[in-house]
Structure formats: structure tokens, C-alpha cells
Amino acid sequence: MISKIISKIIIACLIISSQTTQAQTADSILLKDIVWDKTAPAGMTELSIPSENSKIAGFMYSANGAQKHPTLLLLHGFPGNERNLDLAQVIRAHGWNVIYFDYRGSWGSQGQFSFENCVQDVKNVVLFCKKYSDSLHIDTSNIALFGHSMGGFVCLKALAELPGIKKGFALSTWDIYSDSKDLKPSQVKEAAKQMGEYFILNTTSEKLIKSVMANLSFFNIQNDAGALANKEIVMLDEHHMNQQLAASLKNSNNNYFDYEVWQTDHPFSNKR
């Protein structure tokens, strides 16, 4: 049995599920050094990715070998202090490329930050992967998403809007809809104060909240249950606030859906 460790869960879902032989221990699944390919060794490539009229900063941990590799996109939270790059190294060691990027208006990327723009950024990164699939050795038939916190919301929303992507991992998903649906206009300033002013460009916390309130249906992931029905989805939480959302998605899912609540903190510090 795979223990409740994020990296082992991801390896099991991404790699083992596509193999015929599963007689491996948890440690042999996880611990694997890279033996460099002499002609196309594993490495890191800096990326400047177009998204609408802006450039977003990113990089790719490229897998070993000149063949095209399946690729995982890491989607950070708000503002995105936990990047999960430890997981990226493990996944790369098992033959996957891993792309990390910063949404528009965050952490040095150009443009305006908004939750809606984050979802569009994922779609534009996928287009970038397709355009440069040969030079970056990306198997565009096998791209998966991994999101944490706000990135969990972005993961599920983008997964619903990208029919060619079949797998998503949503870690401690921020249910923006549930947090905003009962908010009154008179409460916006206080909510913005509690949210704080993070390092984001060309917007404010108050504007972000007002944008959500003006487009609540977009943020209700349960509205996307049909589009997610044939996806493979893993949702992990450290709390029980997403149980209703998870139950709704699971009831509509025809492929694979797993939801678990672990004893940990928001960044899953003891479950790497």
C-alpha cells in the first residue's frame, strides 16, 4: 500500500497506473536517482511564456533522454509561497518534465493578476507546450496538472476547460465560491483587509473580491462537474471544508476520483 505521502501518491497515479507490473515497495517507487543520458541529460530550462499580451516567467525541469516526455504543470497558490519543487524533482526523476510558472502579475511575471487570468494562463502554458513540443521534448498527449490552495481551484477549473488533459491533482483546494457567495457589498472592504495585500501587480485585494462577486458562477466548480466527469482526479485536504465539493465531483465522475483528508497543515509539511 502506498502511504499517505504526496510524492508517492503522485508517482502511483502518474507512473504506476500506466505500467503492468506493480510489485514495488513504496520506497523503491519514490527513491530513484537519475543516470544521465550523455546526449540529452536531465536539466533545467528557463521559460518566457506568452499569455495574452504579457510574458510570464517559468522554468522546466527537463527529464532525462531525447524522447518526448509526459509533463506535469505545477500551479501555485495565492500568493504562492509553497512551490512544491521538492515534488517536481521526484517526478522528474521518474521520466516526467515538470513546468513551474508564475501567473500574470505574480512573482515577476508581467501583466495583471486575477483569479480568472490564472486559469487562462494555464491554458496558454498548454498552448506553449504544444508549440515547442519538439524542442522541449514534451509529449502533449500526456500533460497533467497539480495545484495547491488557489492553485487547486485553478487546476480543477483549467482541467474542465482543457479536454485534452485527463489528470489533475488538487491539494487543499481553495473553494473561492463558497468563501464568497454570501458576501455582501458592505463586507468587501473588511474581507479585503483580512485577505491582505500580497505581491501582485495591477490590482488590489478589494478588486479581486469584487471580480469574484460579479462572476460567481465561474468560481463554482460544481458547475464544471460534467466537464470533469471523464477526468482522473485526486483531491487531498487538511480540513473537511471541501467535502461537499468533492462529493459532488465524485458523484459525477465516470473515470477515477479520490478524495482524502490527512492530518497535516496547509502546505502538507509532514506529508512530502
Each language-model region and where it sits:
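Hydrolase active-site cap/lid region
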Residues: T25, K157-K207
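N-terminal cap/lid segment of alpha/beta-hydrolase-fold proteins
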Residues: T25-A66
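Short beta-strand element of the alpha/beta-hydrolase
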Residues: K68-G77
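The serine-hydrolase catalytic nucleophile loop
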Residues: G77-V90
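Conserved alpha/beta-hydrolase
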Residues: I91-Q110
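Alpha/beta-hydrolase active-site loop
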Residues: F113-L136
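Alpha/beta-hydrolase fold nucleophile elbow
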Residues: L136-S149
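Serine-hydrolase catalytic core
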Residues: L208-R272
